[in-house]
């Protein structure tokens, strides 16, 4: 830094002032790169304003209709990626935090829910952590929770919704496969058509492709797999049977539970075959009862997964709200400094 005394007049009358010394090259470099406090605050305001905008966009996607399409999922994923980028900028710019803000963010983001689904344990956070490290930790954990937790549930609900809609389409055809028997005490059922439709749906969702995989979420052009441990963790979290675990190449994926559909086919095989199988009322009622029980199992699974998705969405939303409050407070502090 400059030696101010070297540029001042002599403090004693009658004594010639000391000749100014030429600053060294390193001193010139220091003068050139150190921004003023005002410039630093101005940079903070820009970074904080951009982050605040991205947070609002992310919050808007969280409040939208639950994702049931690839387009909706892509929109939410993009909003989370942009939020992460803006948080990375805060980490690099070194936006300062108050002691209370530092502690609040550290305690909120040091143990994210995504750690529950990680094969390796999280390192315990240090007691003291710098503001830049806090922003970096927040950025990494927001990204991890968004992609590895909420993002998984978005994909699970989207795939299962498509699956259940396909099953509902089969149910809509049932009226055409049922007809009264000859004496009014029997019912004719087109077993072959019903069984063929259900078998086709089973075949579709037991194939491993981007449209049938629940976990891991599929993005990009290639197909992504996970380790066996990760896949098993998600099977447990989703409360699905072990049969949903499938090997794919060198990794594993989790598929839809087609067990209820297989039970339907088995029950149809048990009553016979044909395009107009005649059943007495008792036999038909017994078959219908079993069929509806499996239909209810499918519906319950979708409802359970949708509720789990809602919980994940709320968790992420709460974290974003904490982050939004901190950024808004920091932004106001930076603006007040410049106005003062």
UniProtKB/Swiss-Prot annotation:
The keyword Secreted applies. SUPFAM superfamilies: IpaD-like. GO terms for cellular component: extracellular region. The keyword Amino-acid biosynthesis does not apply. Residues 291-319 form a coiled coil. Induction: Transcriptionally regulated by SicA and InvF. Also regulated by InvE. Pfam families: T3SS_TC (PF06511). Residues 1-26, 57-76 are annotated as: Disordered. Required for translocation of effector proteins via the type III secretion system SPI-1, which is essential for an efficient bacterial internalization. Probably acts by modulating the secretion of SipA, SipB, and SipC. Belongs to the invasin protein D family. NCBIfam families: PRK15330.1, SipD_IpaD_SspD. This is Cell invasion protein SipD.
């Amino acid at each position: 830094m400059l030696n101010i005394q070297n540029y001042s007049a002599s403090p004693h009358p009658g004594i010639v002032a000391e000749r100014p010394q030429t600053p060294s090259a390193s001193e010139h470099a220091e003068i050139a790169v150190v921004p003023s406090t005002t410039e630093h605050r101005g940079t903070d305001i820009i970074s904080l304003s951009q982050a605040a905008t991205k947070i609002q966009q992310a919050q808007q996607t969280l409040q939208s209709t639950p994702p049931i399409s690839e387009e909706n999922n892509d929109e939410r994923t993009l909003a989370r990626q942009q939020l992460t980028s803006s948080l990375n900028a805060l980490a690099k710019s070194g936006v300062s935090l108050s002691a209370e803000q530092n502690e609040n963010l550290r305690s909120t983001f040091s143990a994210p829910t995504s750690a529950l689904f990680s094969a390796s344990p999280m390192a315990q956070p240090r007691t003291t952590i710098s503001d830049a490290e806090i922003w970096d930790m927040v950025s990494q954990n927001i990204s991890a929770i968004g992609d590895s937790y909420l993002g998984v549930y978005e994909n699970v609900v989207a795939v299962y919704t498509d699956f259940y809609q396909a099953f509902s389409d089969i149910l809509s055809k049932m009226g055409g496969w049922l007809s009264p028997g000859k004496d009014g005490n029997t019912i004719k059922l087109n077993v072959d058509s019903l069984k063929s439709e259900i078998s086709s749906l089973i075949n579709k969702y037991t194939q491993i492709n981007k449209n049938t995989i629940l976990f891991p979420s599929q993005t990009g052009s290639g197909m992504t797999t996970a380790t066996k441990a990760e896949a098993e963790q998600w099977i447990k979290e989703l409360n699905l049977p072990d049969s949903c675990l499938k090997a794919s190449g060198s990794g594993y994926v989790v598929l839809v539970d087609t067990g209820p559909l297989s039970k339907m086919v088995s029950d149809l095989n048990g009553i016979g075959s044909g395009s107009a199988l005649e059943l007495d009322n008792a036999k038909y009622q017994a078959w219908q009862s079993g069929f509806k029980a499996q239909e209810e199992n499918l519906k319950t699974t979708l409802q359970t997964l949708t509720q789990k998705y809602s919980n994940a969405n709320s968790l992420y939303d709460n974290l974003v709200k904490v982050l939004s409050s901190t950024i808004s407070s920091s932004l106001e502090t930076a603006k007040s400094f410049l106005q003062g």
